[in-house]
């Protein structure tokens, strides 16, 4: 492999890892908030969270990336607002789409881990007279420890999903690989 191509591939790998890290950070924060809203069953927010989960788990990631990148530009009020400085950037749009996607899947994962907490721990919290917030403070770390092995799969899926960012002009690992393949006509 030529040194020039190696440096391009390393640059693409750095972009893919940056997208993965930022998406996981934003997605994890969102998913923890969404999980808490599902657990506490806050009336309106609960159904809004359910709708987001259904939307982002029921559509392909490529469609989500296209909608986040090409969709907002169709509205004048978005193009004229401060949001356009962010939504016109391909990197931000790819990160946002990946973050929302991983937030939806991670929320289901964290909710499942929370539901797997043994009933005895719930009863112990009730016996001690804890309210919902205090119970969450005690049981949420336990649930998160149970969710870590499954969350590692989500990390891999997000990294794989970054290859779709090359469809909206981001030169990540896949983008550089396709360019090199097109220039040299070899793998």
Where are the language model's segments positioned?
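Transmembrane alpha-helices and adjacent helix-loop boundaries
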Residues: 1-187
């Amino acid at each position: 492999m030529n040194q020039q191509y190696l440096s391009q591939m390393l640059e693409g790998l750095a972009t893919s890892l940056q997208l993965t890290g930022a998406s996981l950070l934003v997605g994890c924060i969102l998913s923890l908030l969404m999980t808490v809203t599902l657990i506490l069953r806050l009336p309106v927010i609960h159904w809004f969270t359910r709708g987001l989960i259904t939307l982002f788990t029921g559509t392909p990631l490529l469609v989500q990336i296209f909608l986040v990148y090409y969709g907002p530009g169709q509205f004048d009020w978005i193009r004229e607002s401060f949001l356009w400085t962010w939504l016109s950037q391909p990197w931000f749009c790819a990160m946002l789409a990946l973050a929302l996607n991983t937030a939806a899947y991670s929320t289901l994962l964290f909710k499942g881990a929370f539901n797997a907490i043994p009933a005895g721990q719930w009863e112990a919290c009730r016996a001690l007279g804890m309210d919902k917030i205090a119970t969450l403070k005690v049981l949420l770390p336990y649930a998160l420890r149970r969710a870590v092995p499954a969350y590692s799969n989500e990390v891999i899926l997000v990294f794989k999903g970054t290859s779709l960012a090359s469809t909206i002009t981001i030169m990540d690992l896949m983008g550089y690989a396709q360019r090199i393949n097109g220039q040299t006509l070899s793998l």
